[in-house]
Structures are given as structure tokens and as C-alpha cells.
């Protein structure tokens, strides 16, 4: 299949409309020698076979076609006197969050049964290869210094709206004496990406291979165990935690690079972690 060609699985799984783009085979340098030891050494990886990857993260609506009871809940505001729980996270088009790795894999299994295709989570090799889309930088669109406003939904000036006060909470004014105590999260105050929380997939620019929100919006589970580099397929199955890749609306760009890794236990449900799926030939 041609790079960037599209496939939709609506015809095979009634009620589930998901668009996929073709990711080619190839080789690249994975990881980085700058920064934390958990993503070094930089080392060559080969992606032997092309695959299809979901162009956006799995939404609440898509996830509920298989798990109708799923509740992404809300994002808690930074204040104490609440009459409501916070900002909504359950809108149908928002990416599903608080999905454990085990639930994400169960979703893949059910979707495989419905479609007759091999649906799964990407390995972290497949994820980084697809994210980079031919780029060798910190982001598919540039470096840590690039204004990410039109490319990814990361921690920008809108995050200051998490600082609210009042019984029916409203964002604090910058002159409020409490303001500095509730706007402590690392963020790029000079960048405006238009949104505070996770939003419907596809609202920002796609990378060169047609994938949206790879480094922002919500972070994403991979199928891989969290083990020291260099990555080795033979040692998979020996770790207890699973690798999560990409940044989120709540992450500073430094924690959202093409090579940045974080990990959680397979049963953990995390407020800024969702997933996207791949289809293997």
C-alpha cells in the first residue's frame, strides 16, 4: 500500500467508523542521547513490515461501541469549593481516557473479531517511527523551540484556566492573590494552541504520513514493555510496566518529544492517557 493511503473499517464493523493511514516499512534512529537515560542510547531500528495506523486517538464514542459503560469522567479543576466535578472528559468526540492497557488490548481483541483483521496497539518502535514520519527531530514538525500552536495540543497558556475559584468556579484573574499558587504547572505561556483540555482528534495539522495528535492531546499506550534500551523484541514479555508515548494537553513539550518514554502498570487508568490502534497485514 502507498504511504498515506487511507482505509476505513466502518464497512466491516457496523457502528465503528475509524480511519487508518498506511505507514511504510523502513529504518530510523530510535531514542536520543540527550537527556534522560531511559531513552538512550540512540540506536537503529528496522520496521520490517508496513502497517495501518489510526489517524486519530480512539474516541469515547468509538470505545463505547465495544465498552458502553466506559466513563472518562472529568478533569478536576485546581480549587476546593466545587459544586461540580470539573471540566468534562466524556464528550463523544474527545479521546477516551482512563483506559487501562488491559482494556485497550481487550478493545483491540474485540475489534479484531468484528473485522477479521489483526487490530492491536503499536509497539513503541512502530509508534516512534510513525510519529517521526521521516523526521529526525524532537517533534515531527521541528524542535523544542518551535511554536507548537498549530501542530499539537500541549501545555500552553490555556492551562492557566485550570486555576478557578468560587462556588460556581470561574477562571481566576491574573491579579488574584491566589493565582500564582494555582498556575504552577510547567507550560509554555507564550504559546496559544487554542485549547486547554483534550479535544476531538484531527483539529491540528497532520504529520507527513497523515497522523494527527501524535505528540499531544492525550498520551498513548503502546504494546511494549518498559525496559532499558536498546529495544530488543526478544526481551519483550520480561517487564511489568507498559510504555506510554507522546505528550498530552497537560504536558510541557520537554515531556512530549518523539523519543520521550513514560510507563504505567497495565491495570492503571490515567487521566491523560488514551490510545490509538494499528492494523497489521
Question: Across the structure, where does each feature detected by a protein language model lie?
Answer:
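Short, small-residue-biased leader/transition segments that mark boundaries at the very start
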Residues: 1-9
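Short aromatic/basic micro-patch
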Residues: 1-2, 22, 52, 57, ...
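Short glycine-aromatic motifs
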Residues: 5, 18-20, 119
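A short glycine-rich, aromatic-capped structural motif
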Residues: 12-77, 99-102, 216
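Residues embedded in well-ordered beta-strands
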Residues: 21, 52, 138, 220, ...
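Functional-site microenvironments in short loops/helix caps that host divalent-cation chemistry
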Residues: 29, 33-34, 81-262, 266-271
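Short, structured beta-strand segments at or near domain termini in extracellular proteins/domains
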Residues: 271-281
Amino acid at each position: 500500500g502507498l504511504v498515506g493511503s487511507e482505509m476505513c473499517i466502518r464497512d466491516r464493523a457496523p457502528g465503528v467508523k475509524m480511519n487508518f493511514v498506511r505507514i511504510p516499512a523502513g529504518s530510523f534512529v530510535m531514542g536520543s542521547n540527550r537527556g534522560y537515560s531511559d531513552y538512550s542510547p540512540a540506536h537503529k531500528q528496522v520496521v520490517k513490515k508496513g502497517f495501518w495506523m489510526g489517524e486519530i486517538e480512539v474516541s469515547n464514542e468509538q470505545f463505547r461501541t465495544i465498552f458502553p459503560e466506559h466513563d472518562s469522567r472529568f478533569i478536576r479543576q485546581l480549587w476546593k469549593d466545587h459544586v461540580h466535578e470539573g471540566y468534562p472528559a466524556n464528550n463523544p468526540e474527545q479521546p477516551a481516557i482512563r483506559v487501562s492497557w488491559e482494556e485497550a488490548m481487550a478493545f483491540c481483541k474485540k475489534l479484531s473479531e468484528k473485522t477479521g483483521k489483526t487490530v492491536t496497539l503499536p509497539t513503541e518502535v512502530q509508534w516512534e517511527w510513525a510519529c517521526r514520519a521521516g523526521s529526525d527531530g524532537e517533534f515531527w514538525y521541528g524542535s523544542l523551540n518551535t511554536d507548537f500552536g498549530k501542530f499539537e495540543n500541549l501545555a500552553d497558556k490555556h492551562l492557566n484556566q485550570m486555576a478557578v475559584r468560587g462556588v460556581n468556579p470561574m477562571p481566576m484573574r491574573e491579579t488574584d492573590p491566589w493565582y500564582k499558587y494555582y498556575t504552577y504547572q510547567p507550560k509554555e505561556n507564550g504559546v496559544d494552541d487554542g485549547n486547554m483540555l483534550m479535544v476531538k482528534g484531527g483539529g491540528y495539522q497532520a504529520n507527513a504520513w497523515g497522523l494527527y495528535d501524535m505528540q499531544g492531546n492525550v498520551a498513548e499506550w503502546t504494546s511494549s514493555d518498559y525496559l532499558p534500551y536498546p529495544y530488543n523484541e526478544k526481551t519483550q514479555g520480561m517487564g511489568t510496566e507498559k510504555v506510554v508515548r507522546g505528550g498530552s494537553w497537560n504536558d510541557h513539550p520537554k515531556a512530549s518529544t518523539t523519543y520521550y518514554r513514560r510507563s504505567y502498570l497495565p491495570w492503571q487508568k490515567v487521566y491523560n492517557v488514551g490510545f490509538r490502534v494499528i492494523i497489521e497485514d
